[in-house]
Amino acid sequence: MESIPAVWRKSTLSGSNGCIEVAFVGGQVAIRHSKDPSGPVLIFSPTEWEAFLAGVRCGEFDLR
């Protein structure tokens, strides 16, 4: 992943708090922790990423 240039983005709502950053590289979605940019990167296919976003939207991951 480091050999491919990526434009990392994070939510403007995160401020200076730790947050995930997302990059779209080579038809895949990469995520990493903003406070550890040289740390591990998770790679997802577009289908996996869409499934994750659908879960977020419907509250599947809410800690209640």
Locate the predicted segments by residue.
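Positively charged, low-complexity terminal tracts
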Residues: 1-64
